A protein has these predicted regions:
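Bacterial Sec signal peptide processing site at the extreme N-terminus
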Residues: 16-39
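Post-signal-peptide N-terminal segment of Sec-exported extracytoplasmic proteins
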Residues: 36-69, 73
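Amphipathic, well-packed alpha-helical segments that form the structural scaffold of globular domains
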Residues: 56, 60, 64, 79, ...
Length: 223
């Protein structure tokens, strides 16, 4: 039930952001034509920064300090292995059958020999990891990226990639496999914290650069 509610909320927000952005675009000073909704995006960006600074970042720092590196490595590999399954499907939809087979092979090898993906054995066997999502697949169908948009909690995106994120969430292998709601919620929270911890060191270098952080993240995403 909570998963269904989240999906509806996420899609509702994308529509709201799109139409409210269209209504206010003429009132904003556009510094970048790719970001016509900059005023609204900056409000959401600042909200995300506060949530991260007050909640997510401290938890991620504690996670990195308390949990041994080999355990964190296994957690990251577990979720990335499930991502290989989704990537295989995306490659297939893009008619890229070679990479689809390679990603599927990675999933099978790591799920078995790598013990549920905890160890990335496939890379040692020469199977290259690639990452594809629904936003990229929509792009291969000729759908333009659209304006830049900052999503609450999810961060930088675009209109097309925002819908792609919603699709990815709905077909996420972990959410499909784990039926118990409490375990599913706990697993997703662990995934968020683990992912956030991987950016702690990079964030320090990023913060040391003397420029508008909003612009820096936007340009990096749209590059």
């Amino acid at each position: 039930m909570k998963i269904l509610f989240f999906q509806k909320f996420f899609l509702f927000f994308l529509f709201f952001c799109f139409f409210s952005g269209c209504a206010t675009v003429n009132n904003n000073v556009n510094h970048d034509p790719r970001d016509p909704w900059e005023k609204t995006n900056r409000v959401i960006f600042n909200f995300n920064e506060k949530v991260d600074r007050n909640f997510l970042k401290p938890i991620a720092e504690g996670y990195e300090k308390v949990v041994p590196s080999f355990v964190r490595y296994g957690v990251s590999n577990f979720f990335m292995n499930l991502g290989d399954l989704l990537t295989a499907v995306q490659h297939f939809l893009q008619l890229d059958f070679k990479n689809s087979g390679e990603s599927a092979s990675r999933f099978v090898i790591n799920s078995t020999i790598g013990v549920l993906g905890i160890s990335d054995v496939a890379s040692k066997f020469g199977f290259t990891k690639t990452i594809e999502d629904s936003g990229q697949t929509l792009g291969t169908f000729g759908i333009n990226q659209g304006p830049y948009v900052v999503l609450p909690f999810f961060g930088p995106s675009s209109v097309r990639d925002g819908f792609g994120k919603a699709i990815d969430y709905m077909v996420d292998p972990f959410n499909s496999i784990v039926k118990d709601e409490e375990m599913r919620t706990a697993g997703n929270l662990l995934r968020v914290v683990d992912t956030r911890s991987q950016y702690l060191s990079a964030e320090q270098a990023f913060a040391a650069l003397a420029f508008d952080k909003y612009v820096g993240i936007r340009n990096a995403y749209l590059a």
